[in-house]
Regions:
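Transmembrane alpha-helices of multi-pass eukaryotic membrane proteins
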Residues: 20-36, 56-70, 88-105, 128-141, ...
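Membrane-embedded alpha-helices of multi-pass membrane proteins, especially ion channels
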Residues: 32-50, 67-82, 101-115, 145-153, ...
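A broad, low-amplitude sensor of folded, mature protein cores
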Residues: 3-10, 61, 69, 74, ...
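Ubiquitin system architectures
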Residues: 1-48, 58
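Helix-loop boundary elements of multi-pass alpha-helical membrane proteins
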Residues: 13-24, 75-95, 157-176
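Hydrophobic transmembrane alpha-helices
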Residues: 46, 123-150, 154-216
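Membrane-lumen (extracellular) interface motif
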Residues: 38-61, 75-93, 109-133, 190-203
């Protein structure tokens, strides 16, 4: 039926060890969910041992809550929203992908934000101690997360469960930018970068934005 004769040569390609896309997503997003609480709770004790005692400021606590909410959202989307074109990817990708999230958004972002440089005394009298300033960017972050979620729902509805159907998304922010899911993701991290004026947050924002531009 397929037109294959007895003398035909069948070539197979060994793709190596494979792992499901969903598993990779769950593992990479789990990193920050574990690392951020450890740094947030442990940083004051650790820095005090080196002679730099500090108390967590309002902006630090705000970033902690927003960061945890962001990655919890990503975990839930990985389970209930995302639909993948392929069932698996090379197993090594779990190391590569997790390095980005565990190292950059976990250790680098957490280590920089939850440090004496943003503690109560350090931000006192600065814009980062202004609650109106912080709440403005919290609102921007919230709108960005909602925009990102709506884009993910739109993409989910384009692909019936159990299929590999590809369709062109229409409506909403898809009429304004090619990949609103990436756009709003970058915007949410811009909000955190702006409210903290943190170099570590800026590094994560730039690296993530470049990567999402390549994906787009």
């Amino acid at each position: 039926d397929l037109g294959v004769e007895n003398v035909a040569t069948l070539t197979l390609k060994d793709l190596g060890p494979q792992i499901s896309w969903r598993t990779v997503f769950l593992v990479e997003y789990a990193g920050p969910l574990v690392i951020h609480p450890l740094i947030y709770l442990g940083a004051p004790l650790l820095w005090a041992r080196f002679g730099y005692p500090f108390s967590m400021s309002f902006v630090q606590t705000t970033v902690f809550v927003l960061g945890m909410a962001h990655f919890l959202k990503r975990e839930l989307e990985s389970v209930f929203v995302h639909r993948f074109s392929n069932a698996t990817m090379p197993a090594f990708n779990i190391v590569k992908n997790s390095t980005h999230y565990w190292l950059l958004s976990g250790l680098v972002l957490g280590g920089g934000v939850y440090s004496p440089s943003l503690g109560v005394e350090a931000v006192r009298g600065t814009v980062r101690d202004n609650h109106a300033f912080i709440w403005f960017f919290v609102l921007l972050w919230l709108l960005s997360e909602l925009g990102n979620f709506r884009a993910h729902i739109t993409l989910m509805n384009l692909r019936p469960k159990g299929t590999r159907v590809r369709q062109i998304p229409r409506g909403g922010a898809f009429e304004l930018v090619s990949c609103p899911n990436y756009f709003f993701e970058a915007l949410s991290w811009f909000a955190i970068t702006a409210m903290t004026l943190s170099l570590s947050a800026l590094i994560f924002l730039v690296v993530s934005s470049v990567q999402m531009t390549l994906w787009a």
